[in-house]
């Protein structure tokens, strides 16, 4: 028997560890996302209908970016820049909020007494070179909008963008002027999308569009695939409210705890915009019927649970599964 390569084994273990530690999706509509070009993606992401799963190597890259923030702060302080309030928060209501990398009180050479919002990003060489050539507004519009929103939330009219090239440690530092119109429109857009009951139109109806091809929502958006996520936010009973809480109509419950939202309950009904099947509503509103192929499947507490249908819609309602459920009433479809 050939022994496993020890270095590969260790690498795999490290990557598995990071994957096991990966964070749950954020509960709010993050300011860092408001510059994303697609309304539908923002809605699906906020509704936890599409949850990106990253391999361990990518998660280690994210960690490197987070660790770089401490180094940047230390370098700025070493040259006399007074930076404070690391991870200060701004909130605009209707679920829109975010955390700043820092607030600079003074010391930026071009404006020594002026306050700045601080934003730090790491880049690949290709990304870094493009940004140096075109500037952050054109090259990284999502980062630029993020800074506009942070300026808006802190009443600071300048931002300092510090970019690091991960390949060769080059720095690109750029001062950004606050644009009130851009910021207010971005916040209003985020609030509108967060409070929308129905899924917005996509950026493009063309599945080969360059901004759609590699999107995590591509199969749901362009190939009529159902969501894979059963949680409170993908449930037809839930509503996002303007006070940044969620309400459950099925149980007449306000302010659903975030921890509970991740799993939900067995009364979950899949939001009709998140599946490709025709829906037949019930009179009491506690369940629905989905027409999947030549079968009509009940979804609700007295029928198939949402997690069963989403795990394998092709077997739900078949004679074999119905017989299995008759013999074992607690049996569930898991795949």
Annotate each language-model stretch with its function:
Residues 110-117, 121, 142, 151, ...:
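Internal, hydrophobic cores of structured domains that mediate oligomerization or house catalytic pockets
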Residues 105-107, 164, 249-251:
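A generic structural motif
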Residues 68, 142-145:
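A generic structural signal for residues located within well-ordered alpha-helices
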Residues 122-124, 165-166, 252:
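A short beta-strand motif that forms part of the nucleic acid-binding face
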């Amino acid at each position: 028997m050939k022994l496993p390569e020890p270095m590969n084994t260790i690498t795999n273990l490290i990557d598995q560890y990071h994957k096991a530690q990966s964070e749950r999706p954020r509960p709010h509509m993050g300011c860092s996302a408001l510059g994303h070009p697609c309304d539908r993606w923002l809605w699906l992401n906020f509704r936890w209908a599409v949850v990106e799963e990253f391999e361990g190597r990518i998660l280690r890259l994210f960690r490197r970016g987070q660790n770089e923030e401490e180094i940047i702060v230390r370098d700025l302080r070493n040259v006399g820049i007074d930076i404070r309030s690391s991870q200060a928060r701004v909130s605009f209501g209707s679920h829109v909020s975010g955390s700043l990398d820092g607030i600079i009180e003074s010391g930026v050479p071009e404006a020594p007494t002026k306050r700045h919002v601080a934003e730090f990003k790491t880049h690949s060489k290709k990304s870094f070179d493009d940004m140096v050539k075109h500037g952050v507004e054109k090259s990284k519009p999502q980062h630029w909008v993020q800074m506009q929103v942070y300026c808006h939330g802190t009443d600071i009219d300048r931002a300092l963008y510090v970019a690091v090239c991960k390949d060769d440690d080059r720095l690109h530092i750029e001062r950004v002027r606050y644009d009130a119109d851009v910021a207010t429109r971005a916040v209003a857009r985020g609030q509108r999308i967060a409070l929308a009951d129905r899924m917005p139109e996509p950026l493009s109806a063309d599945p080969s569009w360059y901004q759609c091809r590699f999107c995590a929502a591509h199969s749901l958006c362009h190939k009529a695939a159902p969501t894979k996520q059963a949680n409170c936010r993908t449930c037809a009973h839930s509503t996002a409210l303007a006070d940044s809480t969620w309400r459950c109509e099925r149980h007449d419950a306000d302010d659903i705890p975030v921890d509970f939202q991740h799993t939900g309950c067995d009364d979950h009904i899949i939001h009709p915009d998140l599946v490709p099947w025709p829906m037949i509503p019930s009179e009491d509103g506690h369940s629905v019927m989905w027409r999947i192929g030549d079968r009509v499947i009940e979804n609700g507490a007295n029928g198939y649970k949402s997690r069963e249908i989403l795990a394998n819609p092709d077997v739900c309602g078949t004679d074999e599964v119905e017989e299995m459920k008759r013999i074992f009433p607690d049996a569930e479809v898991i795949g």
